[in-house]
Curated annotation (Swiss-Prot):
SUPFAM superfamilies: Zn-binding ribosomal proteins. Keywords: Ribonucleoprotein, Ribosomal protein. One of its GO terms (molecular function) is structural constituent of ribosome. The gene is rpmF. This is Large ribosomal subunit protein bL32. It comes from Acinetobacter baylyi (strain ATCC 33305 / BD413 / ADP1). Residues 1-44 are annotated as: Disordered.
Length: 61
């Protein structure tokens, strides 16, 4: 079992944890379709930076 060499203070512990906070996804609105999507990601329609990268797949139902 691991045993600490020296006790860490609350300050040191909290400084280590300062990078553990979660951030919200950055969202943006597509200028052509008005759809909200994550930045630097392709929309559901297959559009990225104003270009159609692939056709939307038809539903399999």
């Amino acid at each position: 079992m691991a045993v600490q060499q020296n006790r860490k203070s609350r300050s040191r512990r909290d400084m280590r944890r300062s990078h553990d906070a979660l951030t919200e996804n950055a969202l943006t609105v597509d200028q052509t379709t008005g759809e909200t999507h994550r930045r630097h990601h392709v929309t559901k329609d297959g559009i990225y930076r104003g270009r159609q990268l692939f056709a939307k797949a038809a539903d399999a139902e």
